[in-house]
Amino acid sequence: MAENAGLENHRIKSFKNKGRDVETMRRHRNEVTVELRKNKRDEHLLKKRNVPQEESLEDSDVDSDFKGQNVTLDAILQNATSDNVVIQLSAVQAARKLLSSDRNPPIDDLIKSGILPILVKCLERDDNPSLQFEAAWALTNIASGTSAQTQAVVKSNAVPLFLRLLHSPHQNVCEQAVWALGNIIGDGPQCRDYVISLGVVKPLLSFINPSIPITFLRNVTWVIVNLCRNKDPPPPMETVQEILPALCVLIYHTDINILVDTVWALSYLTDGGNEQIQMVIDSGVVPFLVPLLSHQEVKVQTAALRAVGNIVTGTDEQTQVVLNCDVLSHFPNLLTHPKEKINKEAVWFLSNITAGNQQQVQAVIDAGLIPMIIHQLAKGDFGTQKEAAWAISNLTISGRKDQVEFLVEQNVIPPFCNLLSVKDSQVVQVVLDGLKNILIMAVDEASTIAEIIEECGGLEKIENLQQHENEDIYKLAFEIIDQYFSGDDIDEDPSLIPETTQGGTFNFDPASNMQTKEFNF
């Protein structure tokens, strides 16, 4: 936050300092939008527990010894090491069923019982694929728990055996191993990179073929998402290079779950800095990503909007790749979407376009989106208004005089000034920056702009901000008042001298008889 404050302070002092502008204006998903990130996490599970819908007849035959009695952990533990194949399988299955219970599975109790090494040993039993499957399932559900529970599975040396099971001739065993690895990778970047280092990517991607059952492919795609997730540190570049061709294939899939996961994977990769953005662009996927902004499923739209939004946090050249795909034609619908979260993401996207070069600013104007941004500035949810304030303020820095003039003609100043009374200091500063930039651009017409600001109640708000606790805000408010509202012709007309308050600030009469002029820079 301190760094952001420094950048904003510098912005006040140096209008049109391009080196700083791009850094501040192009905003990645950081602390400003933490609530969006939380929403994304809710939508996208890091870990999943395998809870069956109903037990099969096969299951009920195998575990008949355990039916009708309260099976103790001691009994499970003892029988899980039995030489009798049926008893051992029944015991491991009983453990799995305990872990598959809907409410509060006794994960910690099972870990404390010492069953982990026994389950891991069962993964080696190529002669008994049913035992491998049940043990893998039980371990999957243990790894679906807390980080400490996942770590217990990792420390029991299960990962190399799960990787080995990816080559099992039995598809259900392969799929369960994929699921377990997905939970371990989902624990965080350390586990992710450990599993990658043991060679998970190639065998995982080999499952992507036309003959794979849809449920299996959904799991594979979900694991790919977890491989792409986390940027502290991001996944190894070699891994990204390996995964991207698979994502370029999966983006054509008709299954909504697979499509959504594929697009989220791309959104995570594009959130990892300009180098990863370039890798995604070079994969050729962007022209197939952009049309998904108008997909009928909101889940697909949301993921696609985040992915393209991340790309336009990159360089002007990277941003242009997205613009060249006719991306702006999708935005009238996104800006009027019934879901507020999509409105907010759409305006965030556009704020990064208005932070670009003048041709990119013009593209937003030509697409007819400025009135829609101003509508969100005036009427949107506060989070959306905040993004709209950035979009407008960025345009006042990046745009030419005629582009800023167009903004004013669209009546941007009243809703812009309304945000000067919010409690969010960052928004207030962004608006003050924008107003000052408009006044600077107006040159000889600055008095006309000043009049508009005064008439909509903006002047009073700026005056009040001279008492703001934030130093940058009160200095900027003072500068605007001093430079544009102190009046050069006061000596000629004493009636124009405003009264001063005790604090030394000016009180203007909004009904002052200023001549109105047609606005024209």
Where are these regions (language model features)?
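Short sequence/structural elements of tandem HEAT/ARM alpha-solenoid repeats
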Residues: 70, 108-114, 151-157, 193-199, ...
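Buried hydrophobic core positions in alpha-solenoid tandem helical repeats
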Residues: 75-77, 118-121, 161-163, 203-205, ...
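Short, flexible/disordered secondary-structure transition segments
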Residues: 52, 56-58, 87, 105-106, ...
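Flexible helix-coil junctions and inter-repeat linker/turn elements that act as hinges
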Residues: 104, 116, 144, 148-149, ...
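Alpha-solenoid helical-repeat scaffolds
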Residues: 60-90, 94-98, 103-109, 117, ...
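Cysteine-rich, disulfide-stabilized extracellular repeat modules
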Residues: 106, 138, 149, 158-161, ...
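Alpha-helical solenoid repeats of the armadillo/HEAT superfamily
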Residues: 83-97, 127-143, 155, 167-186, ...
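Intrinsically disordered, low-complexity regulatory regions
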Residues: 1-84, 89-97, 459-521
